[in-house]
């Protein structure tokens, strides 16, 4: 629950079909924090993005013990690895995507998002195709960004409906996003939700 600091991590064992709750707390003797937004596993390490605690924890997936953390983040949402020594972390309430070195748990730079204010900044999920990373901009936004990972610059963008909430790529290299349309009374506007399929090669909408 937002602002309650009661995020938890559970583990499901598919062989025994059992669930262990509060595994982070039991392994580390401290709460996970305020809003565990997302998690990925890479090479036996779990990366838990805790949004309103401004931190990303690295944990051993066998013991659930913390092995490191990335701090001084604004309000992190998702992490995407480019290599062992480089990753992107998206943010809400910030007009930057953070560049980090996961081996050193350090912030090494930023990607400035054009035409986005700090107060209404919102970058979310990331999908990679070749050297480009695509990012949907959610809260009070309507864009999908294209980032060149060699230069760490936004090189293009697609305008979609109001508030694209998620982003995936299918087996045919088609990019899909769905929008929530905002809400009634929103200063950014309100419309019916939409589903988009995008040809990644030419940036054209195939389903809208």
PLM-predicted stretches and their roles:
Residues 1-208:
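Predominantly soluble domains enriched in secretory-pathway, periplasmic, or organellar proteins
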